[in-house]
Amino acid sequence: MLTEQLDWEKTDGMMPAIVQHAVSGEVLMLGYMNKEALEKTEATGKVTFYSRTKQRLWTKGETSGNVLNVVSITPDCDNDTLLVLVNPIGPTCHKGTTSCFGETGHQWLFLYQLEQLLAERKHADPESSYTAKLYASGTKRIAQKVGEEGVETALAATVNDRFELKNEASDLMYHLLVLLQDQGLDLGEVIDNLKSRH
């Protein structure tokens, strides 16, 4: 168990826990865990801290619903600090921002947020949005759209139309993300696959 390998004496029983977005790498917040908070975090898969002001365990998002789903917990080389990789549901900060350190503007984070939105639309009323209608039309139609947008992207590049290339590449990425969601895959899996090749 992770609690046993940590140096609790060095931290006076309160382990600093740096919370980082598992996809974008953005630092979201810093909290403190005692042994009980860490054990609850491991047991539930939701980040739980020890609140020094409330003097009790506090699961992030327990009232707002903006929970932090744990991907991994790794101690540093001295076993006196934790790095907690998470997939957040909603904003992390009580001020409504992605990070407690303000909006850092990480561009890759937008793709993750778009992917979350597309996942929500998968089960929405087809009349509510283009995306929901696209899901309702089925895999063949979604795949056809990816093919069409791929060809249009290539054609824009061959005529050196940077404006149109940007627009068509955006359409291609959008439709590709819809197709991945339709097939139960996410962008993280594609990124992992790319990493394994290089």
From Swiss-Prot:
Keywords: Amino-acid biosynthesis, ATP-binding, Cytoplasm, Histidine biosynthesis, Hydrolase, Multifunctional enzyme, Nucleotide-binding. GO terms for cellular component: cytoplasm. It comes from the Bacteria. Pfam families: PRA-CH, PRA-PH. The keyword Cytoplasm applies. Residues 1-110 are annotated as: Phosphoribosyl-AMP cyclohydrolase. Pathway: Amino-acid biosynthesis; L-histidine biosynthesis; L-histidine from 5-phospho-alpha-D-ribose 1-diphosphate: step 2/9; Amino-acid biosynthesis; L-histidine biosynthesis; L-histidine from 5-phospho-alpha-D-ribose 1-diphosphate: step 3/9. Coiled coil: none annotated. Residues 111-198 are annotated as: Phosphoribosyl-ATP pyrophosphohydrolase. Its main location: cytoplasm. Its EC number is 3.5.4.19, 3.6.1.31. InterPro entries: His_synth_HisIE (IPR023019), HisE (IPR008179), PRib-ATP_PPHydrolase-like (IPR021130), PRib_AMP_CycHydrolase_dom (IPR002496), PRib_AMP_CycHydrolase_sf (IPR038019). It catalyses: 1-(5-phospho-beta-D-ribosyl)-ATP + H2O = 1-(5-phospho-beta-D-ribosyl)-5'-AMP + diphosphate + H(+); 1-(5-phospho-beta-D-ribosyl)-5'-AMP + H2O = 1-(5-phospho-beta-D-ribosyl)-5-[(5-phospho-beta-D-ribosylamino)methylideneamino]imidazole-4-carboxamide. It is an enzyme of class 3 (hydrolase). GO terms for molecular function: ATP binding; phosphoribosyl-AMP cyclohydrolase activity; phosphoribosyl-ATP diphosphatase activity. The keyword Hydrolase applies. It is found in: Cytoplasm. GO terms for biological process: L-histidine biosynthetic process. NCBIfam families: histidine_hisI, PRK00051.1, PRK02759.1. PANTHER family: HISTIDINE BIOSYNTHESIS BIFUNCTIONAL PROTEIN, HISTIDINE BIOSYNTHESIS BIFUNCTIONAL PROTEIN HISIE. This is Histidine biosynthesis bifunctional protein HisIE. It comes from Klebsiella pneumoniae. The gene is hisI.
